[in-house]
Amino acid sequence: MSVADIKKSVEQKMQRSIEAFKNDLAKIRTGRAHTGLLDHVQVDYYGSMVPISQVANLTLVDARTIGVQPWEKTMVAKVEKAIREADLGLNPATSGDLIRVPMPPLTEERRRELTKVVKSEGETAKVAVRNLRRDANEQLKKLVKDKEISEDDERRASDDVQKLTDKHVAEIDKLVQAKDAEIMTV
């Protein structure tokens, strides 16, 4: 494995860590409605668990309400039950074959709890990025040990990996700040 391969690999893995972090952030509820909030809700569809998006159409009714329209009338009760049991603090209301999911306003205490969760998720993502840096540096040291590259090349590559790490950690910090601001906005 060459130095370029190691750098390319670590950058791709760091980018995947950022994407996973963004997905985790999307699941954290703010005061506003967005359909991504229900993405991980699983519905019992004739004996197998499937994502809600495979059995219903998700739309925004207004800024604080998600509309869920199951494609089969028989699924309305199951979809409503799945949303209620998803531990998101949501209380869906059914009218006909449309399920309305209003977003309750967040209390000040709940907002503070959520910002702590966001910061914790951010730290976890940073640790993942730093672990990738460590793995890349170990691979570079192995190349030096095997006499495939010089120590100067290893030092330069190590500096490049550090710059990638700094860039991705800064991106995580930016995402955390943005999510905190979104949560604290009343």
From Swiss-Prot:
Keywords: Cytoplasm, Protein biosynthesis. Disulfide bonds: none annotated. Gene3D superfamilies: 3.30.1360.40, Ribosome-recycling factor. It comes from Burkholderia mallei (strain ATCC 23344). One of its GO terms (biological process) is cytoplasmic translational termination. It holds the Pfam family RRF. PANTHER family: MITOCHONDRIAL RIBOSOME RECYCLING FACTOR PSEUDO 1, RIBOSOME RECYCLING FACTOR. Belongs to the RRF family. This is Ribosome-recycling factor. CDD domains: RRF (cd00520).
